[in-house]
Amino acid sequence: MNKAYYIGLMSGTSMDGVDAVLVDFAGEQPQLIATHTEAIPSHLLKGLQRLCLPGNDEINRLGRLDRSVGKLFALAVNNLLAKAQIAKEDIIAIGSHGQTVRHMPNLEVGFTLQIGDPNTIATETGIDVIADFRRKDIALGGQGAPLVPAFHQQTFAQVGKKRVILNIGGIANITYLTGNREEVLGFDTGPGNTLIDAWIQQVKNEPYDKDGEWAASGNTDQQLLAQLLSHPYFSLAYPKSTGRELFNQAWLEQQLSEFNQLDEEDIQSTLLDLTCHSIARDILKLAPVGELFVCGGGAFNTELMQRLAALLPDYHIDTTSALGVDPKWAEGIAFAWLAMRHNLGLPANLPAVTGASREAVLGGRFSAK
């Protein structure tokens, strides 16, 4: 059988590395051939975190970081291909998500901005790059996010089976597959790992709470949890999407100002419950019973998975491994899939999910020639 190799590149709101995946789309189901994570150097990470906050001299910083992130993404591709021992000539295209530095779709003139110059990726890898997937959807009146539900529908939908696919990155999003292949819902539920990562980084200088152990050692403060859950985002009707613009360290500090007496591990436990409760509430609104399959970094947080199970007693819960897709690489595979859709001239957004006025071919092509 002929191969249909595409590469997917993803760096999410967690900014915990660039995931690069090599996927073969020749068969009915995507086949994961090789994977690689490229660490984000600390100087680049600091620059990106600064750019995500309001500040001065942003245009110079944006321009420099756009190129630097492009070079980092290209390095991820070249290392992936070296590891897989596959020639660049065998790759049809790279699908690059880029690094989101602003996502503000609800302004009068909404916009989203991802950096990681695709021209740089194309020239440094010698492979055509398909990128800028979100802005066409926004131009059509949509949120530009989440985009993964279209991939979830194609890969995980089964006639007659109600399934929820939960992707927990920095932000969490859900896809509700109703059992009718044509019908799908999806939206961002709110914070995934972003606040629990930010708090442990601030207090313990650790990148993330492994297995949720620190959160498990604390006790949730119900008053703080109720205050956090009163954020207006949680009561918005979908389609909706969010990011660091709403849920960030500055917002967290503001929320904690009246809770100085709390132990640090109790705050961590409360933040984990914010993630779990906001996800569970939205899932229960869609269907009281069903199957839940989890992917993204959150799938590996044992405490998070246990708390979700307790909040969703009538759900059968597993990771997407049970459906044949490695939960760690699911989002990277989705962006390889988006590149494949663009290459074939096929639409890749779901208006019922994003609120766009119509389906559209997403992204632009940046030639390596």
UniProtKB/Swiss-Prot annotation:
Binding site for ATP: 12-19
Organism this protein belongs to: Shewanella sp. (strain MR-4)
Name of this chain's protein: Anhydro-N-acetylmuramic acid kinase
EC number: 2.7.1.170
SUPFAM superfamilies linked: Actin-like ATPase domain (SSF53067)
Pathway per the UniProt entry: Amino-sugar metabolism; 1,6-anhydro-N-acetylmuramate degradation; Cell wall biogenesis; peptidoglycan recycling
Residue runs in coiled coils: none
Superkingdom per UniProt: Bacteria
InterPro entries linked to this entry: Anhydro_N_Ac-Mur_kinase, ATPase_NBD
CDD domains: ASKHA_NBD_ANMK
Keywords, in A-Z order: ATP-binding, Carbohydrate metabolism, Kinase, Nucleotide-binding, Transferase
Family: Belongs to the anhydro-N-acetylmuramic acid kinase family.
BP GO terms, sorted: 1,6-anhydro-N-acetyl-beta-muramic acid catabolic process; amino sugar metabolic process; peptidoglycan turnover
Pfam families, per database record: AnmK (PF03702)
One Gene Ontology MF term: ATP binding
Record-linked NCBIfam families: PRK09585.1-3 (NF007139), PRK09585.3-2 (NF007148)
Function statement: Catalyzes the specific phosphorylation of 1,6-anhydro-N-acetylmuramic acid (anhMurNAc) with the simultaneous cleavage of the 1,6-anhydro ring, generating MurNAc-6-P. Is required for the utilization of anhMurNAc either imported from the medium or derived from its own cell wall murein, and thus plays a role in cell wall recycling.
Catalytic activity: 1,6-anhydro-N-acetyl-beta-muramate + ATP + H2O = N-acetyl-D-muramate 6-phosphate + ADP + H(+)
